[in-house]
Amino acid sequence: MKSAWALALACTLLLAASVTAEEVDVDATVEEDLGKSREGSRTDDEVVQREEEAIQLDGLNASQIKEIREKSEKFAFQAEVNRMMKLIINSLYKNKEIFLRELISNASDALDKIRLISLTDENALAGNEELTVKIKCDKEKNMLHVTDTGIGMTKEELIKNLGTIAKSGTSEFLNKMTEMQDDSQSTSELIGQFGVGFYSAFLVADRVIVTSKHNNDTQHIWESDSNEFSVIDDPRGNTLGRGTTITLVLKEEASDYLELDTVKNLVKKYSQFINFPIYVWSSKTETVEEPVEEEEAKEEKEETDDNEAAVEEEEEEKKPKTKKVEKTVWDWELMNDIKPIWQRPSKEVEEDEYKAFYKTFSKEHDDPMAYIHFTAEGEVTFKSILFVPNSAPRGLFDEYGSKKSDFIKLYVRRVFITDDFHDMMPKYLNFVKGVVDSDDLPLNVSRETLQQHKLLKVIRKKLVRKTLDMIKKIAEEKYNDTFWKEFGTNVKLGVIEDHSNRTRLAKLLRFQSSHHESNLTSLDQYVERMKEKQDKIYFMAGASRKEAESSPFVERLLKKGYEVIYLTEPVDEYCIQALPEFDGKRFQNVAKEGVKFEESEKSKESREALEKEFEPLLNWMKDKALKDKIEKAVLSQRLTQSPCALVASQYGWSGNMERIMKAQAYQTGKDISTNYYASQKKTFEINPRHPLIKDMLRRVKENEDDKTVSDLAVVLFETATLRSGYMLPDTKEYGDRIERMLRLSLNIDLDAKVEEEPEEPEDAAEEAEQDEEEVDADAEDSETQKESTDVKDEL
């Protein structure tokens, strides 16, 4: 019974399906242009409008081009233009890709003009209310189109602006608008030279076609192959509404500029911060719903289980049969969606916006350590945002000073000009990243020599001041733990190189000191902790903190409670030498002459008595024992535990500096032994309270010709040389002298020879060697025989 009922139901459904099929056009297909729509729900009018938009960007058809060339009015380029184009094509622009930057820049200028006119003329935008730049690649026709809805050009302007170089469309416009401007309105946005940058199109194009529509004229076409140009009324009439389309018929080797990715990357690289939206005609794959074909529906129904067929067919009747299909969709894609936040007041920009902009602009993943957003006014006006990265860029000091800095991008009226500067920022600030946008710099073909412009020096000066202000505001804990670790060397180099900002930079310096085992100290903090009558800032340089704090030069200073700054980096001593004073306090290298302490009258008398007592020893050292090695010998005020030290003059090299200079000389292959500073003799300071020195005084008084005492004096000198950070010129002689002193201390005769190893006759040596081999062989045979016996026993 149930089977009969199911069979009847199936027949009924099949009959209904056949009736439905008769009502549907079997030959109907999905509309070919459905994929042109971004959304399946878009209306036909929207699709048509967008397609017409694309067609307007296309090049002229063959018949129209033929008509243009037959009826067009021919013109010769001005002589200066011919020379300029040859200069551009052959040498001026080393990088061809900038042609797109120039064309977009010109489009932006044209949009600026019409926007300004529209403020006083409500009908100015009647032809086209959009203010945009649109770019379309046509691979089939080998054409690239750049369209703007700017002010456009009349026939006369096309001839004048694109055929001559003496008159610039933008500068003429600026002169005309001067009378119309209110005193409170800036005309700097209109500065530029349209006609010059335009010729860069011939870097990549064999032929350039300019279609332009001005509100006060009909639409015209300008065409050139760089030898001559022609102008004619556009036979298509007004297709633009208002604005200009530049069509480039690309050279064979420039076909890469028809690739969407290439064009998009160039727009983002050079023009992402233009004031007006820039669109590129782009494709992407989207999934759309399409009706299911009748044959597919039948196949699905046949595969359906008999027991569920009724239920499924009933559900399908309630909704249309569709399937998901991937389609290529073409539409305008916005390229410059990142707003130029430096154009907004800093109070209106959130911290998260700065961080997001930094990551996009610098291609970094981390947030910046610090940033500053400011507007500079005066001789030159510009807006800027500067950032300190969270970590030092890789290879920060590779080829320091010889490589360009890539981290400051210069814009002129939101148009990227270059980041290839050698002196936009000083070398020591080569880690700072940011943008500079000025309205006062020229935006024309001469930008390749822009870094010679006098206004850049003014910009540089202000950038440095603002950067130092930004660094100064970094919190103390973050500064010491992070900034100084990453960029401390840069600040020290700044003290050496930047005379005008040396005082500001000195306040940013941080060093280790005897005040704390691990914390860094600033010079301000050091001065605050100075003793009441202390008039100098004491420092000691060494290869490490341990070396510096164990130096004999700091003994008395530390004992008396003076704080000593430890310089442990190679650049540190250079840095301090470049800094004559800080807060009225001069620096004193404790490894050099000049360390003196306040002393009472009693202390002074005691010192003078000691000097008189040790005068024989001091004179003997200077005139006899160390005659060719030292400048003079004196009693030391800085030693407490060490017997002696070797002290450089105020203008000589300390031990640390000499080591650095020699290391540099080895790298460069130079010989510094004849250098004035290296060849200077040093002062030999002795500690009159040390037992070695006291005993030497006694021996010299007894017999100043004693060879042992002379050796002792030289050993003390050489030991002091090493402990003072210097290198010995002859280490073998030093070793021999130490050996003699050890012999004396152990009562070993100085002439005692080293016992020689007895030599065996060659024949005896060979016999002994043969005997050893025979013994080894006998032992091996014995061992083998024993192993064989053991095996037999086991068996």
Curated annotation (Swiss-Prot):
Q: Name one GO cellular component term.
A: endoplasmic reticulum
Q: Which InterPro entries match?
A: HATPase_C_sf, Heat_shock_protein_90_CS, HSP90_C, Hsp90_fam, Hsp90_N, Ribosomal_Su5_D2-typ_SF
Name of the protein in question: Endoplasmin
- Basic and acidic residues bias: start-end ranges: 783-795
Q: Name one GO biological process term.
A: intracellular iron ion homeostasis
Using the UniProt record, name the top-level EC class of this enzyme in a single word.
hydrolase
Regarding protein family, the annotation reads: Belongs to the heat shock protein 90 family.
* Record-linked HAMAP family: HSP90
- What is any Pfam family matched here? HATPase_c_3
Q: Which organism is it from?
A: Gallus gallus
Q: Which UniProt keywords apply?
A: ATP-binding, Calcium, Chaperone, Disulfide bond, Endoplasmic reticulum, Glycoprotein, Hydrolase, Nucleotide-binding, Sarcoplasmic reticulum, Signal, Stress response
- Motif Prevents secretion from ER, residue range(s) on this chain: 792-795
Q: What is its EC number?
A: 3.6.4.-
Write down the glycosylated positions.
61, 106, 216, 444, 480, 501
Q: Where is this region: Disordered?
A: 289-322, 751-795
